């Protein structure tokens, strides 16, 4: 039996919705935000057996051929709006992609603040060729028990397995926090000290490092689960 599988999952903490709905002068420990997707093909061999007149059990062994796996994590996200003189947003962002021929494409941009130079940011992707990006195995286990002519119960453990991927293309944010403390002691003219333009450029550059991802290349192989589930009926 040959099948193609694809799945998508996300994890959004309750605190994220609380922050979006009730933004106020307090601290929010939002936690971890996650989104991921995967696709693979499976070659399955199964067998079932009647143990007695009431109980039947079955198992399926599956050989997995990974096509692609993508994970995005925004870890330890915090928003501190409790202070009167500054607001802080922090978190570690990481994107991981396992797929044959996959690469991130980057562009070089200049920081707004004079003298800070340039930075690289991921702005596109490229897939040079295609094929199998990983291999793995999985098991399906199940049982059906007939209580009487009217009642039958069943249980199944599905997709208990893993895929070992040959590459992990990784990108992370350069800066793990953004702090806004307002505009203080600024002047319109440059010769009289800090200007509004200069102060705003500092915030823009800080936000740039926080939200943009930088390519870190191939971090090597990794092993991921395919999402085991338990069903009862």
Residue ranges and their predicted role:
Residues 1-6:
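N-terminal accessory alpha/beta regions
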Residues 7, 11-233:
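Outer-membrane beta-barrel porins/channels
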């Amino acid at each position: 039996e040959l099948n193609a599988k694809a799945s998508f999952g996300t994890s959004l903490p309750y605190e994220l919705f609380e922050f979006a709905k009730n933004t106020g002068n307090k601290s929010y420990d939002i936690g971890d935000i996650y989104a991921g997707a995967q696709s693979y093909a499976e070659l399955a061999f199964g067998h079932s057996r009647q143990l007695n007149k009431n109980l039947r059990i079955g198992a399926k062994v599956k050989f997995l051929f990974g096509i692609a796996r993508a994970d995005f994590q925004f870890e330890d996200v915090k928003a501190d709006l409790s202070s009167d003189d500054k607001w802080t947003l922090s978190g570690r962002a990481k994107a991981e992609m396992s797929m044959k021929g996959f690469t991130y494409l980057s562009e070089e941009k200049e920081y707004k603040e004079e003298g800070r130079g340039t930075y690289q940011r991921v702005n596109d992707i490229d897939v040079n060729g295609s094929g199998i990006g990983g291999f793995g195995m999985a098991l399906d286990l199940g049982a059906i028990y007939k209580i009487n002519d009217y009642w039958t119960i069943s249980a199944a453990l599905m997709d208990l397995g893993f895929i070992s991927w040959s590459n992990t293309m990784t990108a992370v944010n350069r800066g793990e926090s953004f702090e806004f403390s307002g505009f203080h002691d600024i002047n319109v003219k440059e010769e009289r000290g800090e200007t509004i333009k200069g102060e705003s450029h500092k915030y823009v550059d800080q936000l740039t490092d926080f939200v943009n991802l930088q390519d870190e290349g191939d971090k090597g192989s990794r092993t991921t689960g395919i999402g085991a589930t338990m069903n009862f009926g």
